[in-house]
Amino acid sequence: MKYHIHKAVVIGSGTMGAAIAAHLANAGVPVTLLDILPKDAPPDDREARNKIVNDGWERCLKARPANLMSPELKTLVKLGNLEDDFGVVAEADWVCEAIVENLKIKQKLMARIDEVRKPNGIVSTNTSGIPVSAIAEGRSKEFRKHFLGTHFFNPPRYLKLLEIIPTKDTDKDSVEFFSWFGEYRLGKGVVLCKDTPNFIGNRVAFGTGAFAMDYILKNGYTVDEVDAITGPLIGRPKTATFRLIDLVGLDVWDHVGRNLAPLIPHDKLGQEYLKAEAPAKLMSTLLERKWLGNKTKVGFYKEVRGEDGKREFWSLDLNTLEHVPPTKLRFDSVKAAKDVEGLGDRLKVLLEADDKAANLVKALTYQSFQYASSIIPEVADTVKPIDDAVRWGFMHQAGPFETWDMLGVRETVKRMKAAGYPAARWVNEMLKAGIESFYQYQRSSPTDKRRAPRSGIADKNGEKVGVYDVVKGKYIKLRKPEGAILLKQQKVVSQNSGATIRDIGDGVACLEFHTKMNALDEDIMNMADEAFNRLETNFEGLVIGNEAENFSAGANLFMMVVGAQQGMWDMLDAAVRKLQNLNMRMRYSPKPIVVAPAGLALGGGCEITMHASRVVAAAETYIGLVELGAGVIPAGGGTKEMLRRTVNPFMRLENAEPLVTLQRAFLQMGQAKVATSAEEARGMNILTSADRIVLNRDHLLSEAKKEVLHMVASGYKPPAPEMIYAAGRDALAAIRIGAWMFQEGNYITQYDHHIAGKLAYVMCGGELTRGQWVSEAYILDLEREAILSLFGEERTQARMWNILQTGKPLRN
């Protein structure tokens, strides 16, 4: 390969630079982070000379959510300064500049890099507002061939968007390679951008955000009202509008908006709202007060302690500029829309209503369509880069044109015009030509009898195969993602309301869950049983995975708590046995079963993962045995499996004592600890060294299938049955004493202590007089006995109901 990236350098240790370096470490790329020398730094004091970069990296390590997927990854990051350590630039395969947004300073740095850059070494800038081509002015031809913009969104670990901006001089091979590197190594959604002001993501965000702020102030909306309306209800994150500005920082938001306005004199729609008087006056006042948002702990929201000592977030009164307690909001349109599942159908309910909330949704929706269409073909020739940038950069459920397709383009254009937000001319020309949608769609698998996915696009559920090209005036073919499997396009083998078995080709099947939060219920268990049966005769291997936000949030608590309160003990016993049996069947399957978790994999979802032949996990997998928070213990084989992984290896050593490793596993389950990444899950013995981690979620199922095929080709054999070391009553007594001390110190409640005692009993093998090796079935029986007894306790039932009603654990 002409290009590779084995070593990288990031210059600039501010918020973005340090976070980019951290994400390179997440991807396994050794990186050196450089910054300037402090003024008057002594020549022989390394610590003093590296103070700026050391401080920047320290802030990065302390940031929450964490920039690194595991603390151990920091060993991949070296620190230095631009005088003593500039030599590393000559060895780097990629140099990423993330310094102050000043053209002259950037150009001066590029001149230094040009002198030492290695042949085929790629150089990029993370600028968000300066023309990329201007930064490379005056540089050598070879430098300019290997120079481009790489605009990450903050924080780089969590936001998928990477805008790549080539100049007219950038070599095509450099662009293709870095696009591949961004997608496959860094796990990014890559959008190729023209070198236009603020590229695509921020151009759309500030063109629509400036309008939103002006409309909100003119029409007397409160901060609470706006954020209640403009979050998940309309397909946007919980940060909605004002929480997002607090997160970004009011100073950053204002700076980007002010810098954008003079760069787009031709953009009348953007100019009108970026220069609006009321928002400018508000922002100026808040900046004078140093109310910058989360970084100063006060902005549009302020954290206060209520009379009961609990945290509350008070919102800013936009008239008095004082923070006020939160208020409960009631809008008929919002109440009606909340009961509707699909985003398109939910928006239709809001757009057809006529109250204050509905009017805000109409204005924001129609203006976003108007503005996004107005900047084509300036920023892109098709709608897809804009949709991708909005989804990946701002975590919207759908981009503006995907949303427009949901609502029906022709009908929406009429409504927009009537509301005073006319669509761009090219949209009307498209409709005149008889083209009714921005995308061409291919129907889903005809054998799929399920309704549209909850997160899907209403009436447009097929795969996108084409997109309207504004310049050419016709659909052009969309490139099929090479590293992705789209389940809805795969043949359905069998299906019920909880799960589907699909044939994903090459002798591999996929078991897909699709209950709410993918909670494990009887339908999923039955379909899993069928999948294992079909695997024996019809397939070479099986993937268990899905395309939902979360792999599985665990067992169906509603079924469990209702069953307990109605005394349905046979049903509960059968349900627990079935999960245990399925997991054991999976562990000893003669054919490989690869589990592909992503998002939440909690409780039973974690237990399924731990019994796989192998795991191929998305990097952003949040996994753990959390049952104690619901008033029970892991009983689908999770307790048994944790003992096998933590205690067994240690007890095979000579003169080993089990207590230390046993206590570590006990605390992990007792505290219901959740790994904050797949990498961290490895350190918790939930994933093993043989399991794989995939940074790009879109590639997860494809990589899981590849793993199945590799295991088949390698002659996969299941593991031999294994005995479990049970430490006996002496270890049980020691753990019980530790739990009692936690209770006495008010770290846990009396009922926490009671549940912990049940867990300890199972982990130690009950009241065995001495430590001994026991069968897996012995521990599974203890798991089942413990959970059934806990189901019958009122305080466990109260914990379950609280999670169902509030989503939060109850400490009773």
Named regions from a protein language model:
Residues C606:
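Short glycine/serine-rich donor-binding loops of glycosyltransferases
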